[in-house]
Amino acid sequence: KGGHGGKKKFCVSTQHYSFAVNAFVDLIKQYGQDEYDFSLRETQTYEIIEDVARMRSEIGILFLNDFNEVVMDKILKSHDLEFHLLFIAKPHVFISRNHPLAGREIITNEELEQYPYLSYEQGEHNSFYFSEEIFSPFERKKNIRVRDRATLFNLLIGLNGYTVCSGVI
């Protein structure tokens, strides 16, 4: 978007992904001039859809899988939006380097069962279909939901928790 006096404006709404932040940094380095007004909104899934539909953001970054694809496609179409695939992700378990399971090549769901599972809460639209995590439909004994990435990582370290995500950092 062109801003007042030639200042470039641009906004991206995204789920909580480091790769999106890194891409945003690259974007600013490539297109940032003397003046710009760029925004990166790490937010809940439904808010991302609303942001793009209402033109608050030019781009939204969402995770789709076999479980949520049909529902999310309907929601996107109802907002007159399109989904474009960036990449296909394989699940990775994120744990701290001091976690008892650290250093293992493969970790099973049974081995993770005793540890807290950390995920992002989705507010009033808190449904499995809006989840940011790859294996969200699985039932877990210990669940902690947070709103921001820093809190998730601090709890992951402090409680020997884990999350499952794309592995793209």
Label the model's feature ranges.
Residues 4, 75-117:
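Flexible hinge/capping segments at coil-to-helix
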Residues 20-23, 69, 109-138:
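Secondary-structure junction motif
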Residues 53-56, 122-169:
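Hydrophobic hinge/microswitch elements
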